[in-house]
Amino acid sequence: MSADPTLIPASPSEDDYVRQVREATPPPLLSEEDPFALFAEWLEEAGKKEPNDPNAMTVSTVDADGMPDSRMVLLKDFDARGFVFYTNTQSAKGQELNAHPKAALLFHWKSLRRQVRIRGTVEPVTEAEADAYFASRARHSQIGAWASDQSQPLPDRHALEKRVAEMGLKFGLGKVPRPPHWSGYRITPVTIEFWRDRPFRLHERLVFDRADGGWTTKRLFP
């Protein structure tokens, strides 16, 4: 028995498909003028939705052989000058950034289905900036910065705990100064790309490129 052709739904027309896509997608990105304002807006939204560390970001560098290296760190500050994080400057990432002062950042907010990719040049923050941020850290974190030879071989967990205890005794109840090997890096972006999920994998990509002291924008195919 053949099927009744009247019971088989007709394939949607091109106009029907376009209408479905438009009805299912959110409005376009609001700002195409200031990437930092748009980033601040997205970060604020992430702070309300992400269960942990909405300021977490991947920092990608290259080593002496050109081999890429990535790790998660926490964004601690940003403004029109760039994006700042703090670390042990003798760590693997610190040495790589000192030798090759360029980096890529990636923010991925799964709860929002959004990501931001940043590429730029790197420079150390000022001594005053590093001192101010270190002073704001919890005391145990300050002591940990002295105790950990970050990225160096560790014989066992006890060795680290012993170092922490030794540093705790050394500083007692007094102020813990910032270690000379602990500071921050600022990534000054040359490119910032905002990506937002849309139905049917027709995602939205908006790219800001630095040019003549300002920004140019372009959209990319998903």
UniProtKB/Swiss-Prot annotation:
Its EC number is 1.4.3.5. SUPFAM superfamilies: FMN-binding split barrel. Keywords: Flavoprotein, FMN, Oxidoreductase, Pyridoxine biosynthesis. Substrate binds at K76, Y133, R137, S141, R201, L202, H203. Gene3D superfamilies: Electron Transport, Fmn-binding Protein, Chain A. InterPro entries: Pyridox_Oxase, Pyridox_Oxase_CS, Pyridox_Oxase_N, Pyridoxamine_oxidase_dimer_C, Split_barrel_FMN-bd. FMN binds at R71, M72, V73, L74, L75, K76, Y86, T87, K93, Q115, Q150, S151, W195, R205. Pfam families: PNP_phzG_C (PF10590), PNPOx_N (PF01243). It catalyses: pyridoxamine 5'-phosphate + O2 + H2O = pyridoxal 5'-phosphate + H2O2 + NH4(+); pyridoxine 5'-phosphate + O2 = pyridoxal 5'-phosphate + H2O2. Belongs to the pyridoxamine 5'-phosphate oxidase family. This is Pyridoxine/pyridoxamine 5'-phosphate oxidase. The lineage of its organism: Bacteria, Pseudomonadati, Pseudomonadota, Alphaproteobacteria, Caulobacterales. The gene is pdxH.
